[in-house]
Design a protein with these regions (language model features):
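Extended catalytic cores of very large enzyme megasubunits
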Residues: 1-284, 288
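Positively charged, low-complexity/disordered segments
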Residues: 289-295
Length: 295
């Protein structure tokens, strides 16, 4: 029996060539406003599939278009340069750019790690994904939209952010060299917390970890039941200020961060067990928060 040497991809929606050839594109504007009419975000002349709703357009453009560091091109795809001969950088202006950086990066890593049986299968994988993304048959999570392909397609790097990855060539856990060559593409995290103020795994350390995840578009949740309740004794002789005081710090920090650097606020989940001494305070606070939200 022949040994399986990789994935074989059968085309269902595309044929060799341009995967977008049957898709109609149009230029649109995207504008996000507050209830009082003030403008949160606005971008004009963006290229979107004609079948997309305005809501889908606004989500794509305001949240998932990269807003800086992207080489600008003319209508023929040639890079634009300034008077010094440097490539002009700016935002993504077409959803094709987003679909391309996602599908081409996934194909690249698949080929790097030997996933495909042949180059033709890798190309079919890429083309099928581009078509399915453009026709809304498929969509990845937000961190993929935000981060995937920024290094592979545009050469973006940035300082290391404390992320680690398993090097496929060695099997070793390795610190990331920069922000985007091996980005953080996972959506949701559950993190633990120790009843400790400043040491690793403690309260303040959690806020740093949460900020790192929020910055790249992820959400996080934690059960805070390990923390002592208000008035419980501390080893230094004082008493704890309680869970609620620390939750307010975390809530303010999360509210100040734009998830993925866009208009989307960070997603955060707080859990407190029913038998925790501060559960009634937490319940009352949560009820008050809900009642203060607009209808």
């Amino acid at each position: 029996m022949a040994k399986n040497t990789g994935l074989k991809i059968n085309r269902k929606y595309t044929s060799p060539g341009d995967p977008y050839k049957d898709i109609v594109w149009e230029k649109r504007s995207s504008k996000i406003t507050n209830p009082d009419g003030s403008v949160v975000f606005e971008m004009n002349d963006v290229e979107i599939p004609s079948t997309w709703s305005q809501v889908a357009t606004d989500i794509m453009v305001s949240k998932y278009f990269r807003k800086a560091g992207v080489p600008q091109t003319d209508e023929n795809g040639n890079e634009l340069k300034d008077d010094n001969g440097d490539v002009i950088l700016g935002p993504e202006t077409s959803s094709k750019q987003v679909f391309n950086r996602l599908a081409e990066t996934w194909r690249h890593w698949g080929e790097e790690t030997g996933y495909f049986a042949s180059t033709e299968d890798a190309q079919a994988f890429e083309d099928e994904l581009k078509y399915m993304l453009a026709t809304q048959m498929a969509a990845p999570n937000s961190p993929q939209w935000f981060n995937t392909g920024l290094n592979y397609k545009y050469g973006l790097t940035g300082k290391p952010q404390g992320f680690w990855y398993v090097d496929p060539s060695t099997g070793e856990l390795t610190p990331g060299e920069d922000s985007y060559s091996r980005p953080q593409p996972h959506a949701c995290f559950i993190q633990s917390i120790d009843d400790d103020l400043v040491n690793e795994g403690g309260i303040m350390d959690l806020w740093v970890k949460e900020a790192r995840l929020f910055k790249f578009g992820s959400g996080t949740g934690t059960n805070f039941s390990n923390l002592r309740g208000e008035g419980e004794k501390l080893s230094g002789g004082g008493v704890s200020s309680g869970v609620m005081s620390f939750l307010k710090i975390g809530d303010r920090a999360a509210g100040a961060i734009k998830s993925g650097g866009t208009t989307r606020r960070a997603a955060k989940m707080v859990i407190l067990d029913l038998d925790h001494p501060d559960i009634e305070d937490r319940s009352e606070e949560h009820t008050s928060e809900l009642q203060s939200q607009p209808d």
